[in-house]
Curated annotation (Swiss-Prot):
Keyword terms: DNA-binding, Sigma factor, Transcription, Transcription regulation
DNA-binding region ranges: 156-175
GO MF annotations in UniProt: DNA binding; sigma factor activity
Keyword field contains Transmembrane helix: no
Keyword Cell membrane on entry: no
Protein name as annotated: ECF RNA polymerase sigma factor SigM
Described function: Sigma factors are initiation factors that promote the attachment of RNA polymerase to specific initiation sites and are then released. Extracytoplasmic function (ECF) sigma factors are held in an inactive form by an anti-sigma factor until released by regulated intramembrane proteolysis.
Region feature (Sigma-70 factor domain-2): 39-105
Domain notes: The sigma-70 factor domain-2 mediates sequence-specific interaction with the -10 element in promoter DNA, and plays an important role in melting the double-stranded DNA and the formation of the transcription bubble. The sigma-70 factor domain-2 mediates interaction with the RNA polymerase subunits RpoB and RpoC.
Additional note from the record: Extracytoplasmic function (ECF) sigma factors are held in an inactive form by an anti-sigma factor until released by regulated intramembrane proteolysis (RIP). RIP occurs when an extracytoplasmic signal triggers a concerted proteolytic cascade to transmit information and elicit cellular responses. The membrane-spanning anti-sigma factor is first cut extracytoplasmically (site-1 protease, S1P), then within the membrane itself (site-2 protease, S2P, Rip1), while cytoplasmic proteases finish degrading the regulatory protein, liberating SigM.
Amino acid sequence: MPPPIGYCPAVGFGGRHERSNAELLAAHVAGDRYAFDQLFRRHHRQLHRLARLTSRTSEDADDALQDAMLSAHRGAGSFRYDAAVSSWLHRIVVNACLDRLRRAKAHPTAPLEDVYPVADRTAQVETAIAVQRALMRLPVEQRAAVVAVDMQGYSIADTARMLGVAEGTVKSRCARARARLARLLGYLNTGVNIRR
């Protein structure tokens, strides 16, 4: 059973100390049964958004996020504290998404055009769908890099650490992704509608 809202095991009810991500992770490793839940809740929205941007469907994103959180929960003891806990969590989520994409690549379940139903015809919704479709057409490595840098706001260095590649690799993946996105989405600036 989760602790009551406002309860922090370190200080009790009404305490003013909010534990840092590193403190929560260390408390989890030390046996605090509420610490990981608190850490996960703190980052859930951003991690889910990252998973959604890196996955083909919302179901894949949910599954990848669950896989990532189980992996983080189990592997917390091996965290070396040489990077921010949030960067570590993001890397685990990205890796879980990429793993699912690689496994699904051999067995596609639906054509890309069928994945995103378009019920609302407003320009904003159409643009968001077009961008999401264009992202899905990128190779997974390019997509992960450009989502982290351009959509999540991570630096090249942080993205390189999250993805486990060199900074130059992140730069080249982002450049290739941006060039392809510009080609795929160039029609948005012309007022011309593409075939659905």
